[in-house]
Amino acid sequence: CALPIFILVALAAVFLFLLFQAWPLIGGDQAANTATIESFTGNRAHNFWQYVGPLVFGTVLVSALSLIIAFFISIGIALFISHYAPKKLATALSYVVDLLAAIPSVIYGLWGGLILVPAIQPVWNWFAKYLRWTYIFDGSLNDPSVADSPSRTVATVAVVLAVMILPIITSVSRDIFMQTPRLQEEAAIGLGATKWEMIKLAVLPFGKSGIVSASMLGLGRALGETMAVLMILSPGLTYSIKLLRASQNQTIAANIAAQYPEADPNIGVPVMIGTGLVLFVITFLVNFVARKITEKASA
């Protein structure tokens, strides 16, 4: 009984600390706040919300893209481990998935920056050449922002984050699929269903709430990811959805990590704490909505 109370107290303490520290910037003297933001951003933003808006957009964009990339691959791997692979292979793959989940994010950042960035450039060049009519893949091959920072774009970061959250979604989904009642599976097979039809009729409906929970866990990891984004993405403060252009977007967590060490205690630190409060609220809302969706799916 004491542990849940401790968790609630800790959560409330973090929220109140962020709110107390950020409130003068959010709800205080707006003229003074404007001067603070203009000084901190070099006149690129004139109020707190104008500054944090592109960061929220970049955070949501990168996280959503990574979830889209990872979701179907994770579910496929989880189904293969739970229902298709021989026992020894399934055990080995489970160990690999669990190991991937334990790798520190800075290692993923090094891999992304040193290996993936140059390796994936030809792929993005192909997208830019043949799919630029879609607007989101509009990235001129002669664009200086691409030439100076090859592949240090939202698209590349989304791929790296997808690899990071893939083992989380896979692991949780695998465990849920393996809990499917044997009687339901045998009943579907007994009615003449193929293995894939049995999965569609029994396994996926049984595991839909678990799939939602796994996806939200992965999304939460992506929302708060710092080092991998910081080490790969060429940052910018815009509302751009051009995934192949550098210096367009930035995430809240990576921006805090980049700015905080050199931030002025009277100017920069309150701004960083304010953006941290926004990230806290976003993460809380995502988990709250996920909880409601899971409850609805379980009903």
Model-derived segments and their meaning:
Residues 174-178, 182, 258-299:
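C-terminal transmembrane helix and the adjacent membrane-cytosol boundary/short C-terminal tail
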Residues 28-50, 108-163, 243-246:
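Membrane-interfacial helix termini and adjacent extracytoplasmic/periplasmic loops
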Residues 1-3:
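Short, small-residue-biased leader/transition segments that mark boundaries at the very start
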Residues 80, 138-141, 146-190, 194-197, ...:
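Membrane-cytosol interface at the C-terminal ends of specific transmembrane alpha-helices
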Residues 221-265:
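Glycine-rich helix-loop "coupling/hinge" segments at transmembrane-helix boundaries
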Residues 66-97, 110, 291-295:
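Transmembrane-helix boundary motif in ABC transporter permease subunits
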Residues 96-99, 103, 107, 169-176, ...:
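Transmembrane alpha-helices
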Residues 20-66, 86, 147, 258-269:
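Periplasmic/extracellular loop-to-transmembrane helix junction in inner-membrane transport proteins
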